[in-house]
Amino acid sequence: MDLSEPIHDFLLVFLGSGLILGGLGVVLLPNPIYSAFSLGLVLICTSLFYILSNSYFVAAAQLLIYVGAINVLIIFAVMFMNGSEYYKDFHLWTVGDGITSMVCISLFISLITTISDTSWYGIIWTTRSNQIIEQDFLSNSQQIGIHLSTDFFLPFELISIILLVALIGAIAVARQ
């Protein structure tokens, strides 16, 4: 999107806070339904980040696949489960929660210090000029198709085989 810099920065901060709040909601909310809705918020904010970075195809795929299918499947699975078993042994804070939060906080602090200590201006971003001219004539979906059929052919085929095995396994489990 061609937005002015203050509007772009405001949307970036707004979507980032939505991502952080949604992620905290996924982890901290005791009700699984609310946690699934928070996951939906995280996935929607992620797709809006893709729209801000002019990746419209990836944003549409994110919305259709993750929000439209995966998150709805999670919500249906949670709704079919017995909700009363979640509140039987609900303790507010356990030792495992403390250890996990300390590990997460230490990882977060190390990530922040690594990002702030990195000299980003020393990195040279190089591209070929003819590659930029060629990419101007192609849409995002055409570029994705070209890269999937040339540069990423083997990983694309391996992922399709893994998904096929997972689908066959799910059918075998569902039959029993």
Curated annotation (Swiss-Prot):
Reaction(s) catalysed (UniProt annotation): a plastoquinone + NADH + (n+1) H(+)(in) = a plastoquinol + NAD(+) + n H(+)(out); a plastoquinone + NADPH + (n+1) H(+)(in) = a plastoquinol + NADP(+) + n H(+)(out)
Gene Ontology cellular component annotations, sorted alphabetically: chloroplast thylakoid membrane
Signal peptide: none
EC number: 7.1.1.-
Claim: Thylakoid is one of the keywords in the record: yes
MF term (GO), any: quinone binding
The keyword Nuclease is assigned to this record: no
Keywords: Chloroplast, Membrane, NAD, NADP, Plastid, Plastoquinone, Quinone, Thylakoid, Translocase, Transmembrane, Transmembrane helix, Transport
Source superkingdom: Eukaryota
Transmembrane segments: 10-30, 32-52, 61-81, 92-112, 152-172
Membrane topology type: Multi-pass membrane protein
Location of this chain's protein in the cell: Plastid, Chloroplast thylakoid membrane
Purpose of the protein: NDH shuttles electrons from NAD(P)H:plastoquinone, via FMN and iron-sulfur (Fe-S) centers, to quinones in the photosynthetic chain and possibly in a chloroplast respiratory chain. The immediate electron acceptor for the enzyme in this species is believed to be plastoquinone. Couples the redox reaction to proton translocation, and thus conserves the redox energy in a proton gradient.
Assembly information from the UniProt record: NDH is composed of at least 16 different subunits, 5 of which are encoded in the nucleus.
Family per record: Belongs to the complex I subunit 6 family.
Protein name according to UniProt: NAD(P)H-quinone oxidoreductase subunit 6, chloroplastic
Phylogenetic placement of the source organism: Eukaryota, Viridiplantae, Streptophyta, Embryophyta, Tracheophyta
